[in-house]
Amino acid sequence: MSGSLNKVQLIGRLGADPEIKQMVNGKNVARLSIATSQTWKDKSTGERKEKTEWHRIVIFNEGLVNIVQQYLKKGANVYLEGQLSTRKWRD
């Protein structure tokens, strides 16, 4: 399908230290939990409201995994750019 785009940009905070896991092929992946928030003023009450969304991020690029492992900790501000990929799992 021409003219389509799958691009995501997030600016948020890490909710926990990154998880670094080794895959079966021996390569490492990083798993991140990122919080993004939006605020607005309720029109009827004038009260300030806030909504936080949590995003699960998986990084496969080895160079980026190394940077994540060295520099990112819980609470860090992060900027992420990538593509959405929907996955299913069973508990």
Roles of regions detected by a PLM:
Residues 1-91:
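Single-stranded nucleic acid-binding surfaces, predominantly the OB-fold ssDNA-binding core
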